[in-house]
Amino acid sequence: MEEIQRYLQLDRSQQHDFLYPLIFQEYIYALAHDHSLNRSILLENPDYDNQLSFLIVKRLITRMYQQNHFIIFANDSNQNTFLGRNKNLYSQTISEGFSFIVEIPFYIRLIPSQAGKGILKSYNLRSIHSLFPFLENNFSHLNSVLDILIPHSVHLEILVQNLRYWVKDASSLHLLRFLFHEYWNCNPLSATKKRGFDFSPKRSQRLLFFLYNSHVCEYESIFVFLRNQSSHLRSTSFGVFLERIYFYVKMERLVEVFAKDFRASLWLFKDPFMHYVRYQGKSTLVSKGTPLLMNKWKYYLVNFWQCYFDLWVHSGRVYINQLPNHTLNFIGYLSSVRLNPSMVRSQMLENSFLINNAIKKLDTLVPIIPLIGSLAKAKFCNLLGHPISKPAWAGLSDSDIIDRFGQICRNLSHYHSGSSKKKSLYRIKYIIRLSCAKTLARKHKSTVRAFLKRLGSEFLEEFLTLEEEVLSLTFPRASSTFRGEYRSRIWYLDIIYINDLTNSQ
């Protein structure tokens, strides 16, 4: 029972933080700008500086102080005197600052509540870094996969209600509604009958991504908790848990009932081999369960979203596949279970035997076709993978050309260092190296062969950053045995900041 209480624990003392006064502080917009700028350095987005002007922020804050109240005209939004003519620009500026402010309660939850306590109250938090241990799991004993397309069309009021559970500040929620209405009235593509946001991964607005993730984590936290108690997840027994407004009030009483009445029988339904992971708009369940059990999971999830979160979900958005015949696609990797044969020679007295063993192993491979497509789109090669020159960079100096190509090559090697087989990665690096040579030869009006012959074999050393050198920097005190063991597969936790070219979607 203590474990369940700890899992569902909510720090109620942090529910009443008032965020609305922070909206009128200029430094909040500076912090939001710096935060987004730092994240965009590796993404090579030089135009971001032009999206925020402190003069605009000062004018906006002055208007916010002078405005007594927000008036939203349902039928005539163009008469709104608060935003004036620069409606889209002001809405975008407020959205950037508000998205930074509304994340504060979630950051606070990562800080220990009292000094001297090293335990972080983050039991319900999820991270993209959970993908790495998922790909390192042993799937040899599992056989079924549920591919789930998470519902992404969400009504505006549902998003506000989700934040209401964590942010007890009515003024901030009213401002959020105001921003939603302004976005709705200003966006010509939103003239549909139903007011809802389509949270597709292609949208880059920070506020929309944050609201989408908070919405997903809202039902994911309940779903994961219920999954830990029973693999069948009978909604008749746990339905009262899903009334989120009174969730933490009822939790103490229900945990006692649960511990007394259900603990004795739930062990029969537990599935200790269930693995769960979420990435972008898709979640995956890998289990040892039978097809009948996976079908129960499928229809439970559909009813779970429809009945308790007001999301219309069709059963066709949940796919059941067999793991040996299925490929998982996460963070630019293609992962699948392969049979790796191994032969062992055994000798007994004068007789020797050859024993063939086939071991199941999850291989993470570099998707060569999508990567070549990305390189072709960026004009490094054609659709067949043949390297071509980059005319747009021919006007740069030789060192700048080599630096740009070398940075892309290093990013790709860094990103796909977790691949179990790097043959495809070597081919991609070859394409980039030859494209660099053709670009330099084009600049000097020479052929590639003559250009390389003149410079010698030491040319393009920027591309020859071997994994042993990377390991020596990452693990300077590691022994040679340690480096040899981990040379084939390394996960870097900062790959989510790498250039868009490495994300081969």
Swiss-Prot record:
Coiled-coil residue windows: none
GO biological processes: mRNA processing; RNA splicing; tRNA processing
Entry keyword annotation includes Cytoplasm: no
Keyword Plastid: yes
Cell compartment(s), UniProt: Plastid, Chloroplast
Family, per entry: Belongs to the intron maturase 2 family. MatK subfamily.
Protein name: Maturase K
GO MF entry, a single one: RNA binding
Signal peptide as annotated in the record: none
Role description: Usually encoded in the trnK tRNA gene intron. Probably assists in splicing its own and other chloroplast group II introns.
Record keywords: Chloroplast, mRNA processing, Plastid, RNA-binding, tRNA processing
Alphabetical list of PANTHER family matching this protein: MATURASE K
Domain of life: Eukaryota
GO CC annotation, single: chloroplast
